[in-house]
């Protein structure tokens, strides 16, 4: 009986977290829209810049990450070696897709946490190795 009561008591999210989430979800939305617009703009800058240099990248619908398939001429390297190439020659750090499972080895993941200037700077560095 005690095990059953304990399972009910410890099931679910910590209550203060639930209360904070409720307040956030029911509160003003202007900051959420501002953050969404910021990430959408960064996504557009990155994807458009990469597409212009010949790296075909589909913009994601809603995320702060961009998954990009490794261009064909670099694909044989695998994601880890391609990431090393980007870091050493383009001075751009991305996450290798292999770190997310075998199916990810043909991809790299860009984060959109940097500002527009840094994203454009990264695209220029990548352009140099293309």
Q: Which sequence ranges carry the predicted segments?
A:
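PLP-dependent class I/II
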Residues: 1-130
